[in-house]
Amino acid sequence: MELNNKVAIVTGAGRGIGKAIAVSFAAAGAKVVCTARSKDEINAVAQQIDGLAVPCDMVDEQQIRELIDATVSELGPIDILVNNAGAVARLPVHELPTEEWDNVLNVNLRGVFLCTKYALPSMLEQGSGCIINISSGAGVVGPANRSAYAASKHGVMGFTKTLVAEYLMQGIRSHVILPDATVSQMRSEGFPTEDPDSLIQAEDIADAAVFLATQRATAHTLELRVSQGLRTRTL
């Protein structure tokens, strides 16, 4: 098994992409910590994969610290962190409430920063680790009516590049996945008439995450773009 006994945290693991990544990591042998706000959802996933469920709100710094502490206490040093939890607001800029802008940025960008900040000491202590951030096609373009989402995902791209600059020489690889439109509850709520056959599957993104988490991925693989019927590796 490619991830045998690796300790992995997956945020937003209760459904969609996060759930698919958690399931695939467990199938590859990892010891997976599933985290999200919904206790029922992550408990169900953790039971399915024999993992650990730790409820956590990505806007609560103390809860994130407790997530990291619980992981190290229960399973040992952290090998892999997948920052997947996300939020979206679909309104034009002039109609977007400031609190909705703040929430999207807090979950999608500040949450990524906080999880990474508190997971890094464990990785630095053992001299190795892998951080996988889930961005989006919106991280390279500016889709209409999703300004906060696009800004946050652009931020994830820049943050990941900085992680490479700061920690690669200390044995910690940092990568970012940019999925195109994916079958998920969040997607169906925003685009209820969209044909799901035109979208990629969460399992495709999970496959990319497993690849990045293993030694098959080199430190020079910064980005993976997952598209319908095509995967492109950007070096």
Model-assigned labels for residue ranges:
Residues T116, S152:
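Active-site helix of classical SDR
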